[in-house]
A protein has these predicted regions:
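N-terminal phosphate/diphosphate-binding loop that engages ATP/GTP or pyrophosphate donors
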Residues: 12, 23-29, 36-45, 56-135, ...
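Gly/Ser/Thr-rich helix-start
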Residues: 50, 87-89, 139-142, 151, ...
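Short, conserved catalytic or adaptor-binding loops enriched in Gly and charged residues
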Residues: 91-96, 160-165, 258-260
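Noncatalytic linker/hinge segments flanking ATPase motor cores
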Residues: 109-120, 141-146, 210-217, 243, ...
Length: 271
């Protein structure tokens, strides 16, 4: 289905928050990073960043540069099968690089942080046991911290700290506010043109209750409301675009909070 470009619905960018002062970017020495892993100085590389900051592409480039690396996803919605366009899986971008923790539970279920932490621990151990370098990549702050900071949410469900990384090297992907706004708007147009509405209609037709799709938020929340006739197309577009911009700001706020807690993030500008 061909849809008109709706970016002009947001001429003044209402509701888009300003981003705090950007961190100073670095240039990383990739061979030195690979050697640090081989020497045991680090046991996980984590590539994080807000939505539309190029983190997946950067992680794939990094994996190729290292040569024997695999990617573990830290995305709270890419775990669901059949939720492809709205979550931006872009699986073709991985090419020959193996990936994990994507498409592991059916759409309609409600995967929780305890399940993710356990699945990550298993995948991380498997990658290391095969002599490969694990690269965690994503923008879900709670998922990242559950994997890298040995969070034990409760005594019954939390994974023991010894099963999780102890020496993570964090890399953050940076884009300017102007570029972030442009990327998010362009990507939303592309997803609508690529069949986002049809994907969500298909999920509803498969028997997944609308309230479950609303629970997933962002694309699944607002497009479901449009499909159900509760929003016009223009209302859906404006609300969704602004929600994604707000979400990107919250992600960056989370990562800067990690820094205030003592986490060193090496910020880079992805090519």
């Amino acid at each position: 289905m061909s849809l008109p470009n709706k970016t002009n619905l947001l001429p003044d960018r209402p509701g888009i928050p300003p981003m705090a002062a950007m961190p100073e970017p670095e240039t990383l020495d990739i061979p030195a990073l690979a050697k640090a892993y081989a020497d045991g100085d680090i046991d996980l590389i984590c590539v994080l960043g807000p939505t539309a900051s190029g983190k997946t592409r950067y992680a794939v480039q990094l994996a190729r540069a290292i040569g024997h690396a695999e990617i573990l996803s830290a995305d709270s919605r890419q775990v669901y099968c059949g939720m492809d366009i709205g979550t931006g899986k872009d699986l073709g971008e991985y090419g020959e690089v193996p990936y994990h923790l994507i498409d592991i539970v059916p759409a309609g279920s409600k995967y929780n942080i305890y399940e993710y932490q356990a699945a990550f621990a298993d995948a991380w151990a498997d990658v290391r046991a095969r002599g490969c370098v694990p690269i965690l990549c994503g923008g879900s702050g709670l998922y990242i911290e559950s994997a890298t900071r040995a969070y034990k949410f409760d005594r019954e469900n939390g994974v023991p700290a010894e099963r999780l990384p102890q020496k993570t090297f964090y890399i953050g992907t940076l884009v300017s506010r102007e570029e972030r706004v442009e990327r998010i708007d362009r990507r939303l147009d592309e997803r609508l043109e690529d069949g986002l509405i049809e994907e969500i209609r298909g999920l509803l037709d498969s028997g997944i209750p609308a309230e479950d799709l609303l629970w997933y938020g962002l694309e699944y929340k607002f497009v479901t409301q449009y499909v159900l006739g509760k929003l016009s197309y223009d209302e859906m577009y404006i609300l969704l675009a602004n929600a994604i911009h707000q979400f990107a700001k919250r992600q960056m706020t989370w990562f800067r909070g990690m820094e205030r807690d003592g986490v060193r993030i090496h910020w880079v500008v992805p090519s």
